[in-house]
Amino acid sequence: MSNYWLNIYKPRGISSAKLVSIVKTILGKVKIGHAGTLDVEAEGVLPLAVGEATKLVQILIDAKKSYIFTVQFGKQTDSGDYAGKVIATKDYIPYKEEAYAVCSKFIGNITQIPPVFSALKVNGVRTYKLARVGTAVELKPRNITIYDLKCLNFDEKNATATYYTECSKGTYIRTLAEDLALSLQSLGFVIELRRTQVGIFKEKNAIRIKSSDAIIKNSLEEKSIKIEAILDDILVLDATDQQAQQIKYGQKCLFNYEKDINLLWVRYKGVVLAIGSLNKSCFNSLRVLNLTQ
């Protein structure tokens, strides 16, 4: 089985699940997962994990992400983007200087209430399904981190502003846009959203799929990224034959390393064997990969 990453560019108008289905059709019978859903109305980087790489998806889900988004001021929609219904309007449109200056207020650790039109679940039901039938949904605030936020452009004529942000996992850009507008004494919703980076995966290197024809299978595999590429900034320990056997069979495994580590990976014969944590020199595996004999 092939085990690698693909840096795929999701176009606007297609769901993340549909894009995964297209890639499955191209590659054949392989296991594929993605590192973080993009809304149908959004576009951009969608890393796909193939084969054993699916066991490392959570690392990318936890990674920093970057977006470029455009806010339409003066209106609010029920979904937070252009696909929703307008539910409120406000005459005040912020000045250019205000649109630029407001960014500093949001950089750092902040709280955010997720939009009801999201894939979150309440009592086992997706909140967007509840919202569509008019069921009241109350979601709790979440802690997120905005590492960078800056205004790239302000269009006074169309009452829009385009922003760039680098943020932590769990950040909803639609909510960020609404909160930006509210902070500027206005209302706002997202009219364009593009994810430009997820961890090591960047927009400039992303593959744009124009056909589901199996003829492009070789082209995709040629652009594949090694499974260990996302582990470059994580501590690695090399396992002996005995340690490798212990890890494979879920047995206690000790390493000659004294510091406690929340996340590291173990390499055996040059390939990824497992990811896990280290507590008092004892390795606790989170996921074990089947890449070695």
Swiss-Prot record:
Mind listing the UniProt keywords for this protein, alphabetically?
A: Isomerase, tRNA processing
Domain of life, source organism: Bacteria
According to UniProt, the reaction catalysed is: uridine(55) in tRNA = pseudouridine(55) in tRNA
Does the keyword field hold Transmembrane helix?
A: no
User: Which Pfam families does the record cross-reference, listed alphabetically?
Assistant: TruB_C_2, TruB_N
Kindly list the GO molecular function terms attached to this UniProt entry: RNA binding; tRNA pseudouridine(55) synthase activity
Is S-adenosyl-L-methionine among this UniProt entry's keywords?
no
Which sites are catalytic? 39
Q: Which GO terms are recorded in the biological process aspect for this UniProt protein?
A: mRNA pseudouridine synthesis; tRNA pseudouridine synthesis
UniProt-listed Enzyme Commission number(s): 5.4.99.25
Similarity-based family: Belongs to the pseudouridine synthase TruB family. Type 1 subfamily.
Functional note: Responsible for synthesis of pseudouridine from uracil-55 in the psi GC loop of transfer RNAs.
Q: What is the protein name stated in its UniProt record?
A: tRNA pseudouridine synthase B
